[in-house]
Amino acid sequence: MSEELKVVLRRSEQHSGFGFSLLGTTGPPHVIYDIVENSPAADCGAVEAGDVILKVNGTDVHRYTTKEVLKCLRLSEQLVTLELKRDPKLKARIKEQLANTQSPHYVDIESPNIYDYHSSSTNSSPNHRPNAGGKGAATTPSQTGLRYKSPTHLPSLRQNSSPLLASGSTTTTTTATHTHSHSRNSSASSTKIKVVETSITTSTTNVVGLTSPTGSVGGGVGGEATSPTFRPSRIPQALTKCAVPKPVPVLHSPQNKRPRPSQIPTKAANGNGNGHTAHLPPQSLQHSNSYSGSPVTRQRFADREPEREPEPNSAPPQPAKAPRFEAYMMTGDLILNLSRTPQTSNPLPAQAKKIDSLRDSPSRLVNPRINGALAPRASGESSPTSSSSVDSPTNTSSDSVKREAKLLQKQQQQQQQTYQQQQQRDSINNSYNRKDSLTNDTLLMCEELEPDEEGEYVLEEDNKQQRQRQQQQRYRQQQNQQRYEYYQNEDELEEQEEVEEEREEDQTHYDITNIETYQSGVGRGDDDDSDRQCLVDDDDDDDAYDDEENDAGDEDYSTNSLGSGSAKQRLRALKQRTATRQQQRNRDAVDCAGRSGSGSSSTTVKSEAGGLGLDETSFSVPTSPISLSTPLIDKETANSVPTSPEPSSLVPESSSGAGAGAVVVRRHNGHVVRKCDAAGFRTSKSEDHLQQIQREGIAAVIPIDIDEDVNSSLNTLLDTRQDSEDSQSMATVIVNNSSLASNNNEGEQTDNRSSSSSSNSSDNNNCSSNTGEPATSETATATATIITATSTRTMNCSSKLNYILCKKASDRDRIVWTYNAPLQPHQLAALQRQQQQQEQQFQQQQQQLHQQHLQQQQQLQQQHQQQQQQQQQQQQQQLYGQQSHSNSHSSSISSSPQHSAVGSPASPTSVSSSVMSSSGSKGALGLGSSSNGPMAAVQQQQLREREQGGQVAQPPSGIPGLLSCPGGGCGNNGGGGGIGGGGNNDQSVSEAISNISSPDYQDDDNLLSSRDILGGMVLSDPSDSDSTILVSDAAAHQRQQLKQQLRAQQQQQRERERDRDRDREQSEHKVVIQVRGLDSNSSGGNGTNGRSEEDVVTLTDEPLGTMTVGMRDASPPVSDDGSDVESLHSYHYSPKAVDMPSAIRLAKRLHSLDGFKKSDVSRHLSKNNDFSRAVADEYLKHFTFEKKSLDQALREFLQQFSLSGETQERERVLVHFSKRFLDCNPGTFNSQDAVHTLTCAIMLLNTDLHGQNINRKMSCAEFVDNLADLNDGENFPKDVLKSLYQAIKTKPLEWALDEEAGDLQQQRANNSALGNVGLNPFLDPPELATAVEYKKGYVMRKCCYDSSFKKTPFGKRSWKMFYCTLRDLVLYLHKDEHGFRKSQMSDNLHNAIRIHHALATKANDYTKKQHVFRLQTADQAEYLFQTSDSKELQSWVETINYVCAAISAPPLEGGVGSQKRFQRPLLPSKQSKLMLKEQLDSHEVQLAQLDQELNEHKKGPIPSKGLALQNYKEKESYLQYELRRYRTYVSILSAKMLADQQQLELQAQQPSPASHEEEADTFPVGTTACTPPTPQSINQKDQQKEQQQQQPTNRKEKKKK
């Protein structure tokens, strides 16, 4: 039974997170996967694996993805409140599913309520068809799959994609007895496991008990699952290979990161590692999947026999890819998935040991790997060791295994030749498709994420869409196969065309996106180049592909092994077996159409010279940052991880024939080796990871194994440890030629061959002349600097179209690393040679561009017609062409510390301090040479000028196609002065990223512009210590804000003018690496080779102001030794350096009080930050304390400003004073600390001696004793202490006050009576201007009791005459009638009496004088007043009572307490806001309550004696007094209201009522017919009686005389 509970977790010092990880789901429910020992989650004791997170800090997380939940937890405070749901049934189901999947993150769960077990049987068919009516993947009989349905995030169900149950469209392709399972990716979370019980055994094992989700036993296991943010792969697929997606990486806390598989290329054993699991020892199946795609199984070699032995040249069997730890790293708008493989399968260390996990199943325990080895690695990944890796081609698990493998290889070569050829082709294809799969695995394209938020898609569609999609797939297969066969070999072109005509309806796509070419010997022939290039350019164009479907496409076709034999042998075997291959092809249901030709992103040079066998020599896999053109070590002979950068001392060599560039390499014993550079530095593995990406292709993520620390991907940055001699790195510069495929409708193929390691081709941009809407081919390109460009073939686009193209291109950003090391002489020489070659290439390309432009204009109309036809055939599917790579060796230069200028303050690892070179390719500007020939020519000219060291003038903004991005984000030079550079003082895109990440970033305009360019950025949850930025989808938002961006950029130009002046003052220089893209050229329909211009990185040592104007260094300088600690510290964004000029200016203004008050100074000096400390130091420099005693200096200091704030704030200010005093008087005291101690003692002494409420003062001896041993262990001189004591005692310290405050105090002193009306200083003075005067006249006053009913002293009891004035609730007593004049305002105002809630009665008990009334106030004071006669007496009594009854505010309830002593309630002194009738009602209610309370009081027993009796009598007296007072109030208010009513009646009867001059001067008492006088009538009568009152005054004066 499920239950809900609430848990509060607190971060601990040992754990930056909370110690639990979530299941790798893309949406709710968010299930806790495991819990780390000694973590907050473990210490809490209430969290268990399998719990579902419902709320985080009160926020419902059912609408958020797992990444967003982890981000929320990552950014939360120290305390986080989790509301969990614990369902044993759900936990059991998840554990059951995880036990089947062998991987902790392959069960994606969307909703806790929608679980459905289903079992269905389908008949295998060689044709594509929907399974179960499009509701799910077919499963074999008696095989039940757990199906999770999700109501949202089904991006695959778009346009022509047929729906499946939460997994897009799923079809089955079967041959013979094997089932091919193809799963379309979607963001729904579903997992279906299909198992066909077939097996393959080798000599090293007997039986395999488990099959992994990513591999099927004997190729007979097929599985399907989905993942949220994947696009279908565009790679042609081989016959025997099933394309399968893999799930999106899920962020994890640093303690619980997932392992990732190594991707070191290994030899294929039975094609293992690509999608099926060969039988290995049980130890080899512990980690089953690499978390780089969706958990599916793939079948290969449909016609394979069950018991095949591995080939001689095949790699060790690789059952599956291991779970991997994942993190994310900011690379512009791309997400690089940095991953690591766990180092061992042994129990985790104490700090990361899991105490609870959903993976505690027997399947994990019974299948450890051989000798504790790691999970198998994908091709190209680094291995942590050189001897123990099970999938190292040069190291098997044991010597016996090696010998057995060799025997088996010989047997296979003799017995299975046909099968070997088939396997060779498949191995090639498997190695080819790794790049694109990893590209899709780690790239979240902005334009493709947007449809994921559109809500729930229908899970079922009719078979019509399925058949339509299959028809389109077959068409794309035909088109790609035609191109593929054309590029196989020019000599066999006609033969291939004949085969195509015969087999037109049944063609197979071969996955060749990531081909690894080999070279036997030193040289390389044209035939090899042609073969390689034909494979590379096979998937150049796939016009019939929809960009919307890319969101859900198959993701990973990668393999862990390479085919056997050399590339030439494989290609020849591939040509010979064309007919057999055609017969074996089936219609593939997965959208695996090839994309633009960036096929060979790495050039692997293989040499068999030296006579060394593959199993006899082990070399390092280079993971240091190199260029795209850097030759790789033979991956089949690599099993360790070198981390040395390559020097850029190699020059490119041209290649004839096919146009492929020869590679200059250094060989050791016939094999490729790489040495450390001259400086002995090696770069970090995190940077090596980027460079591996650059080699492997477009955004391919190459997970690397880091053996130092699994919790941080940056812990080896700038590691200065030497590598072995066998790991010396070499850099090469190879000409990079970008090609464009011709139109598919023409049936002509453009023989574009790339001579660099990054061969980039761009597809046609289908641009309709009517709408002007471009179908831009875009594919994010990840290199060491992550640069992407959009190359277009649009011929006649409007200005609006060009801007849109520019906008899309600006979505891709660059990251360039800078280091603090000088260039070596050989590097400078190589750089100069490289630049010279570049200039020559520019000139050649300029001529070609001119010729091509003329040809393109002639074919403009024809191409537009063809493009329109393609749009109709493809149903408006946009092309995704891989963009031009920069083939420069920017990584090898920029990531090496010795390649930076001396004194560069930038951190080599901090993105914020790196110089973000924002130079993009022309394609990024929408200025492809085919569509904008003149503009391309302008660009080429500017590039040439930039190479020659000159600044290129910014073109006019009105030129179509030019987009000015902030910071020159789309320009061609680092200063942003190129095309679309945005001005020399603009901020680059990457700097905008760093500023946004910086806590001090507050520039709203810059933030807006950078967000526009990047498509919106959100901080993602880093699973390690790296600071990450996740680029979200905002392509539509970018289009909408295109105009805003242009306007914002103009404003930024003006704002950066100021920054440029300041930056130019700095004397530091930076090495700025510019990454320029390639201008892809269209070859047209004539089949001519389109050779684009090659843009090579330029390394310049120019001042900061000229290269990167407006850049700011947000990281502290890195130490010269390039240590890891410094680099790690500099990586995290630190506050900006103190702006000393600003601090000096502020200190000067504070000292001169320029715009500040004295009370403002302390606030600026007492803050605990660097800037405030700098201001305080500068402020104290304005004081001169030479030859002054400490108390004199302190008095001078405190008179300048008002020292205020808390104790620690005051102490900070005094610290600066102590430092300044000791600087002015060196030697007077032992240290600054001693001065500070004595200063604080003086402050305390001043308070003690001159405090108001301190009875006992400190003596001089005590002052001396208190300071003993505080002068740095010594005593202060006694004479000094005595002099200080006497000085403070004689003259206290004076505190500075603001002038306004001083004036106010003076005014209050002059008018003290206004602030102290009466004896209570806490009561506000009345408003004299608005007060109503009720009565005045001469009276005699006698004080009987002061406040609190205390008797007045005898000296103050005497009768005194005053001129009394009643205004509102205050009775003013003056000497004469002129008391309210300004000259006499303060005269006797202290005698004023507040009469709120007062009572005036006749003093009948006082017999010494006549006409006396008693006034009792609310504070229990009592006065006697004598009037001239009885009428005057009655008038004063009634007037005072009326004012008190009408104006006094209703009382509050009395306090409640446990005291036995009676406490009178406090009565309010404010005036009432009630109307007269409401006031009367209030008094009546209060009267009733008092009467009831008095009755209750009398009913109680009367205490006999003591305090109880006193309290009883006091309370009784109070209640009786209050009853009398309220009865008087009610009586007088009732009479007043009755009189007013009668007066109104009389006025109604008599229009001109008679005057009442004869009516008595008294208020009516009881029910009388007389109208009570108003306050105005009372005043009039008082004036008439003034003459009578003057007579006693005259008599009194005579007596005085």
From Swiss-Prot:
Residues 300-311, 353-362, 1053-1071 have a biased composition (Basic and acidic residues). Residues 113-192, 211-322, 339-440, 459-657, 737-780, 872-965, 1040-1126, 1544-1601 are annotated as: Disordered. Residues 118-128, 283-297, 339-348, 510-519, 558-567, 617-630, 737-747, 1568-1579 have a biased composition (Polar residues). GO terms for molecular function: guanyl-nucleotide exchange factor activity; microtubule binding; phospholipid binding. Keywords: Cell membrane, Cell projection, Cytoplasm, Guanine-nucleotide releasing factor, Membrane. Residues 166-191, 382-399, 409-424, 468-487, 640-657, 752-780, 872-942, 949-965, 1040-1052 have a biased composition (Low complexity). GO terms for biological process: axoneme assembly; compound eye morphogenesis; negative regulation of microtubule polymerization; positive regulation of ARF protein signal transduction; response to alcohol. Transmembrane segments: none annotated. Residues 1-340 are annotated as: Mediates regulation of axon branching and microtubule organization. It is found in: Cell projection, Axon; Cytoplasm; Cell membrane; Cytoplasm, Cell cortex. Belongs to the PSD family. This is PH and SEC7 domain-containing protein. It comes from Drosophila melanogaster. The lineage of its organism: Eukaryota, Metazoa, Ecdysozoa, Arthropoda, Hexapoda.
